[in-house]
Amino acid sequence: MPDAFQFAVWHLAARAAAWLRPPALMRGRETGPAAPSGISVVIPSRQGRQLLAPQLPGVLRDLPEDAEIIVVDNGSSDGTAAWLAAEWPMVQVELSADPLSFAAAVNRGITRARFSHVCLLNNDMLIEPGFFTALRRAFDRIPVLFCATAQIRFPAGVRREETGKAVMAQAHRDDFPIRCDEPIAGEDLTWVLYGSGGCSLYDAALLRVLGGMDEAYAPAYVEDLDVGYRAWQHGWPSVYVAGAVVEHRHRATTSRYFRELELAEILEVNYLRFLARAVADRRLFRKLWTDAIDRLRRRRDGALRNAAAIAIEGGAREHGHYPEERFLALTGGDVAVFPGTDESAPPLVEFAERLDTPPQTKLARHSEVVLVRSGNELARDAAIEWTGGKQPVGDKRAGGTPSREIRLPRES
């Protein structure tokens, strides 16, 4: 274990390096020709035959007619490719003899995908019926939606470490800066910072505009946060979909190749990499960076040794038009969305002391009720903006000016 002096040196170097981070880049990419409507399921798998066997039947049953499954079999010696060819001939196999990082594996699948939407699905996820329908429906409700992400449950008796409702918030300053909040009964289509790369549906064209997953995040973790954040910078949101449910056998692959302490350090290093590579606003970057390295020093976390080099090698790759502090307020754990029962009525955005299921009488008078924790005016303003942009259920308009008719009752 390094001594206190060594941690102090690493910390000082990291603080100085934050001022040397390269400026954000402006990059344009072509989206390519329009893809046919449908879903391409991309499943990265390493030595995963035993995980795929119980997963694939549910996926095949639930997929719509216009769909395909691509398994990216990488670094396997368990006969996965031959088994798929014999037992699941409808499944396409993208083969790599060498093991790939998560980002590299899914990017191979994304490149091969031919439909309008791409579902990234870990091989340790078991989907429940209606999974694909619920995710796809979100894109009919929300214009320019980037990602719809599923509700994540864990097997009985296993502590729930993920929920799908990802926010940037800390209960304590030494907590990891990203957490998953417990969904509220009746909550659906709440904005989230990003969708889990293990159970989310993406707009394939927008995903390609962003260059897919950033392969700097090796071997795994935080690449999904990175791409979701970069999408928000362009005004392309992600939402939590309560009706799309998966059961997750947590770290069924990574735990075979890395110890828990190694995985924890990979997560911390890649979070630093995310700050350096994704956060474009320089003032916001320096604040989040300082918070992160101060936290690592207090925890005496070895990830701090990498911080200075990560900052200097960084430089945000996107510089979109949508203010970062605005979408961080919207996805900071202070907002919850509840579908109403009157589709013809206007939505409602209001402050609340507690985020809890609204009474049925209120839901019956609105197409949607959005609760914002009292006092967070930036989140309230962002919620008004985004709620006004949603389409009514069944309205498939591709353009036009969204309705902004939103009542704002005074806080009592």
Please state what every model-predicted region is:
Residues 118:
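Short aromatic/hydrophobic "clamp" motif used to bind/position activated sugar donors
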Residues 14, 105, 111, 125-126, ...:
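Acidic/His-rich active-site region of diverse nucleotide-sugar glycosyltransferases
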Residues 193-211, 216-245:
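A short, conserved alpha-helix in the catalytic core of glycosyltransferases
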Residues 57-66:
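Short, acidic, metal-binding catalytic loop of nucleotide-sugar glycosyltransferases
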Residues 58, 73-82, 98:
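A conserved acidic beta->alpha catalytic loop
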Residues 1-17, 283-351, 358, 379, ...:
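Non-catalytic, C-terminal membrane-associated alpha-helical segments of glycosyltransferases
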Residues 2-58:
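N-proximal low-complexity "stem/linker" segments adjacent to membrane-targeting elements
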Residues 96-113, 123:
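Glycine-rich, basic loop-to-helix element that forms the pyrophosphate-binding segment
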